[in-house]
Amino acid sequence: MRCPKCLLCLSALLTLLGLKVYIEWTSESRLSKAYPSPRGTPPSPTPANPEPTLPANLSTRLGQTIPLPFAYWNQQQWRLGSLPSGDSTETGGCQAWGAAAATEIPDFASYPKDLRRFLLSAACRSFPQWLPGGGGSQVSSCSDTDVPYLLLAVKSEPGRFAERQAVRETWGSPAPGIRLLFLLGSPVGEAGPDLDSLVAWESRRYSDLLLWDFLDVPFNQTLKDLLLLAWLGRHCPTVSFVLRAQDDAFVHTPALLAHLRALPPASARSLYLGEVFTQAMPLRKPGGPFYVPESFFEGGYPAYASGGGYVIAGRLAPWLLRAAARVAPFPFEDVYTGLCIRALGLVPQAHPGFLTAWPADRTADHCAFRNLLLVRPLGPQASIRLWKQLQDPRLQC
């Protein structure tokens, strides 16, 4: 009596195994057709950062730590994960995506003004470069004979002239293998002073302003990241590393270059380096700049590097842009980058030399900076003074 039962069980197990193999094979086949690879070879796998891939259904990765309650962002992410190949957040029109947010979020009217504005236009990711009325200069592409090893992509705002000049005179000053760019939106808008002619003069003088025709407000910082990734793909695809930093950061450029050049090649190819936050949760207290309503997002944040300053491998740019098309918009650029990194199956690398909450009372101690790579915030005068001290060959620590 036992033998027939054993044979029946064995037959059932073999059938289930065959079905599993078939499902995995057909799923992998659909994935390869739905997502052609970006140009070039993907970053090499490493034990900490395996080769990036983009699942046909992103919920296989994002859904592991993001629950599916009634929060709007979570619902949108699951919808994006099931879209057909080629569809993204702009499918059906980016304004339509924003209008849906206003109608589907029951307490949308109670959201802070900036968050409401973000949601109404968050899916709009295609903006032309902006040329000042005074005839500013377009930023040149990276030439085949002059590809930067490290691109310094610094987020700024039109009126922060002193901060940009301080960067030019200090850690962003000309050096072999270094190129400096500032990322700005349009200086036109929101009842401020007319900065058009001043920005035009600055653009002609330095040719280092990447300007786009969108309103430069805090919740558009994610947009700057996405437009930079697209610009890199068209104009500087072979850059080795990209530092994305705020204009009030101070970077010990020689120390950062030394660290990057010492990295093992496999690690360098998929690098996402900075001051890493893990197991962070949304702030639920209304009134703060990082307030997130429960009706918008539920769950914890992914591991991410602080938006004050971090480094990515240049080879990751097309992969991040590809992932971003299938990750629902989020108002904080560092968290959003962390979501895209996780969608690619990568993890951030923490470095103790990145400190984005530097205490003001330590600024006078220039020796404290010898082993650091990036700190913020520092004002223009403090940055210039510190840079001169660090360049002094007589410096004793």
Swiss-Prot record:
Residues 39-53 have a biased composition (Pro residues). The keyword Nucleotide-binding does not apply. Highly expressed in small intestine, pancreas, spleen, bone marrow, lung, throat, and ileum, and weakly in fetal brain, cerebellum, heart, liver, tongue, breast, uteri, and testis. Not detected in colon. Differentially expressed in human tumor cell lines. Pathway: Protein modification; protein glycosylation. The chain crosses the membrane at residues 7-23. GO terms for cellular component: extracellular exosome; Golgi membrane. It comes from the Eukaryota. Its EC number is 2.4.1.-. Glycans are attached at N57. Gene3D superfamilies: 3.90.550.50. Residues 24-397 are lumenal. Keywords: Glycoprotein, Glycosyltransferase, Golgi apparatus, Membrane, Signal-anchor, Transferase, Transmembrane, Transmembrane helix. Induction: Up-regulated in colon cancer. Residues 1-6 are cytoplasmic. GO terms for molecular function: N-acetyl-beta-D-glucosaminide beta-(1,3)-galactosyltransferase activity; protein N-acetylglucosaminyltransferase activity. Interacts with B3GNT2; this interaction greatly increases B3GNT2 catalytic activity, independently of B3GNT8 enzymatic activity. This is UDP-GlcNAc:betaGal beta-1,3-N-acetylglucosaminyltransferase 8. The lineage of its organism: Eukaryota, Metazoa, Chordata, Craniata, Vertebrata. The gene is B3GNT8.
